[in-house]
């Protein structure tokens, strides 16, 4: 009975080393998307303040890379510290694969929740990505949870998966039972292998959300990418 509003800041965009077929920020595909590196803490603070003023309950820092390098992780930590001191909004992160030490540091910096999506069912995943495994993603979720971070995970629907595979993903989410579930609806990006993928019917999208809510009644569900066009 409550709407939770979260604003994302894509602090590092494009040129990701992974080959996820849906992603316009992968270095494997020519999508014409602008590339930029990490901003300064001051630049992020300005945007975080605006997000809070506009009613956001949380602010999520997202980076398009496989995992943060030690140098980039230090920069992200400085950004988080500045947000904590100067804004006072709940911080969440989506930074790719983490080490145990990095996860513990995020917890120390009062990061509330860590996002790392499964993307799709385990049986579908090899068709979607070949540069890392499904187990790699599960391992990162376990590392984050062991560090005391709340979990946000989910996937993308409309990748060409079957209904059975959507249920497979949902059952995996029910096993993990994250505090937050994020579901994206594919927006086909020109230049990616899925650029010609047919959109899901709205009735199918509603059915998927209904099943997720039925199986995970306590998790926050967030409608993420694709919500504007579906």
How would you describe each model-predicted region?
Residues 1-5:
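Terminal or standalone catalytic/regulatory effector modules within metabolic enzymes
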Residues 6-43:
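Canonical Radical SAM [4Fe-4S] cluster-binding loop centered on the CxxxCxxC motif
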Residues 28-47, 51-141, 149-159, 179-184:
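Core AdoMet radical
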Residues 63-66, 192-201:
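Glycine-rich phosphate-binding "P-loop"
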Residues 135-194, 206-224:
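Conserved C-terminal portion of the radical SAM core fold
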């Amino acid at each position: 009975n409550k709407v939770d509003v979260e604003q994302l800041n894509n602090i590092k965009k494009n040129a990701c080393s992974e080959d996820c077929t849906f992603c316009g920020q992968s270095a494997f595909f020519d999508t014409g998307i602008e590339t930029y590196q990490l901003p300064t803490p001051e630049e992020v603070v300005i945007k975080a303040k605006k997000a809070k003023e506009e009613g956001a309950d949380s602010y999520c820092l997202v980076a398009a890379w496989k995992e943060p390098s030690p140098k980039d992780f230090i920069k992200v930590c400085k950004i988080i510290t500045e947000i904590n001191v100067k804004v006072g909004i709940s911080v969440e992160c989506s930074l790719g694969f983490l080490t145990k030490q990095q996860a513990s540091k995020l917890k120390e910096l009062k990061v509330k929740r860590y996002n790392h999506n499964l993307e799709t069912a385990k049986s579908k995943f090899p068709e979607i990505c070949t540069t890392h495994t499904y187990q790699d993603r599960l391992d990162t979720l376990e590392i984050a949870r062991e560090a005391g971070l709340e979990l946000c995970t989910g996937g993308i629907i409309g990748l060409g998966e079957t209904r059975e595979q959507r249920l497979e993903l949902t059952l995996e989410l029910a096993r993990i039972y994250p505090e937050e579930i994020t579901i994206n609806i594919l927006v086909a990006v020109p230049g990616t292998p899925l650029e010609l993928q047919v959109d899901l019917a709205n009735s199918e999208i509603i059915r998927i959300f209904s099943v997720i809510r039925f199986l995970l009644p306590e998790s926050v569900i967030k409608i993420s990418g694709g919500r504007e066009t579906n």
